[in-house]
Amino acid sequence: NEMRLPAFVGRLNHKFANGSMLSGRSFVAEKKTSQDEEWAWGVGIGGKYQLTPKTFLKADYNHIKGDGRFLMWTNSSYVIDDQKHIQSNEFDSISTGITHQFNTQFRSTLGYGYMKAKDNNAFARINKDNTAQNKELWQGWINGMYNPYKPITLGMEYVYGERETFDGRTGTDNRINMMASYDF
């Protein structure tokens, strides 16, 4: 890895009077090795719709080529082929969820996320037997977040998901997460 330039990121937000929001995002990033270089890029659009003062829907769509560091659920950004050339991962992802603030201390989110990698390119062919790289992946989750007092947040989340690798192997993710955070 011989990258010297940072990622160039652009974002445009539009907020509505009722608390809803639309967002457009893009980035370009250098990918460079001693033998090859390429530009990674991505575009995304998302929104938040305020259903009630305490409930909102959120959705995002992204298309990325060559860099997955800005999103969860992604594969490696690229792989190096036999000729030492960069072969980029390319994928689409969506996520959606609904969040409700029950009172000043407790909120909950029900969400869903999906990622589908392009499976007819060199990245997929090279990673055909790699069990760490996903052709498709989805997850659903429900959580509860409790703020006993500011700045402490305690949370619990149930996650279920399924994945498929480029060679057709499948797996499941079925877990409970617990967290505690302190906002400085």
Regions found by a protein language model. Name each.
Residues 3-5, 11-134, 138:
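Detector for outer-membrane/organellar transmembrane beta-barrel domains
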Residues 139-142, 178:
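A generic structural signal for well-ordered alpha-helical surface patches
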Residues 29-32, 158-164:
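A short, acidic, flexible beta-alpha connecting loop/helix-capping segment that sits on the rim
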Residues 108-111, 143-159:
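Conserved active-site loop/cleft motifs that coordinate metal ions or position small ligands
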Residues 146-148, 152, 171-184:
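Outer-membrane beta-barrel "beta-signal"
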